[in-house]
């Protein structure tokens, strides 16, 4: 069982349940500092398992593919652990505010249905624009000043959805949602 727990500190509703401590050698945990300490894009994280053979093989794979992250990134993670252990909780509270804002705005738009996520920092609303694919809608939104991903980028079942990240300020989310609403009205001929 491979358990991806990179969003373990970004949970708004309920509690994160981890497989850590199960002592089951079939469990391999993947985690990241990139999400926890807003180091997105750095791709710095770790793997844990009680399975020594699996860890030996993954260590070899990691060594031959990437060797290690650069020194500056390693020192940044160390500084985060030593000096900013409360940062993830503060960041999570802010992301919850942003989540509530973007979901409220999206759900107030005709033809848009947005599930309220329990964690992470993305929403994946269903967006209905007759005669247009999610990619076409995403391109029109980009022309209107809003960056999002078409749901089809995440597989066939994603068609008809868009993915928005709420990693920007609440003011920028509000401006982005104003633009989104205007573009969707234009596309629907309203």
Map each language-model feature to its residues:
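PLP-dependent class I/II
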Residues: 1-190
């Amino acid at each position: 069982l491979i358990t991806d727990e990179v969003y373990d500190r970004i949970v708004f509703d309920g509690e994160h349940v981890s497989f850590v401590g199960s002592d089951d050698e079939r469990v391999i945990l993947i985690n990241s500092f990139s999400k926890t300490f807003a180091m997105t894009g750095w791709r710095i994280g770790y793997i844990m398992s009680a399975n020594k053979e699996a860890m030996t093989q993954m260590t070899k794979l990691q060594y031959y593919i990437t060797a290690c992250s650069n020194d500056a990134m390693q020192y940044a993670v160390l500084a985060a652990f030593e000096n900013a252990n409360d940062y993830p909780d503060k960041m999570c509270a802010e992301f919850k505010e942003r989540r509530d804002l973007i979901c409220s705005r999206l759900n107030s738009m005709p033809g848009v249905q947005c599930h309220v996520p329990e964690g992470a920092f993305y929403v994946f609303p269903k967006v209905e624009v007759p005669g247009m694919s999610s990619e076409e809608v995403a391109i029109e939104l980009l022309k209107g000043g809003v960056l999002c991903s078409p749901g089809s980028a995440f597989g066939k079942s994603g068609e008809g959805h868009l993915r928005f990240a709420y990693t920007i300020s609440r003011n920028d989310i509000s401006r982005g949602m104003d633009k989104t609403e205007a573009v969707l009205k234009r596309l629907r001929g309203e």
